[in-house]
Regions:
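Divalent metal-cofactor coordination and adjacent catalytic microenvironments
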Residues: 1-148
Length: 148
């Protein structure tokens, strides 16, 4: 699904990378359910450095996951340049399909079954948007991320 999908999240664990133009108080990630992260940055001389994993925390709020410096820790000095700080992270419910919540799996199966049963109608529409049933919407609604 990814950040631009219907749900706005990764279902099965996937590795993503988000680039930043330097360190700031928090480094907001585009996906929720982040389980691991690594941070690299370019120092003032342009040399790539790695932030010690004990120097930051992975947190989340109502918007998404984010990375913040650990308590009593200050971010290192990074070159203020496009993409000078890089966060590589794992997002998703887990490694296995069974890790995806049951109601979400059920909604996906219902949607795929409905599309298969009505494939002639779907193919006539072309590549336009396909409406989901009320049942599918109800099953996936708790996992849908609304963004502005």
């Amino acid at each position: 699904d990814g950040y631009s999908g219907v749900l706005g999240r990764a279902l099965i664990n996937q590795e993503w990378r988000q680039d930043f133009d330097g360190f700031c108080r928090i480094l907001r990630l585009p996906l929720p359910n982040v389980s691991a992260a690594a941070i690299t940055y370019d120092d003032a001389d342009g040399v790539e450095q790695t932030v010690d994993s004990g120097s930051f925390r992975i947190l989340s709020d109502h918007m998404s996951a984010y990375v913040a410096a650990s308590l009593d820790t200050v971010w290192p000095s990074a070159r203020m340049d496009a993409g000078s700080v890089r966060v590589t992270f794992t997002a998703g419910f887990g490694d296995e399909p069974a890790d995806v919540p049951a109601s979400l799996r059920s909604g996906i199966l219902l949607m795929v079954g409905d599309l298969y049963e009505n494939r002639a109608t779907v193919s006539e529409r072309g590549s336009g948007r396909i409406d989901m049933s009320t049942t599918v919407n109800a099953l996936i609604a708790p996992y849908r991320r609304m963004t502005v």
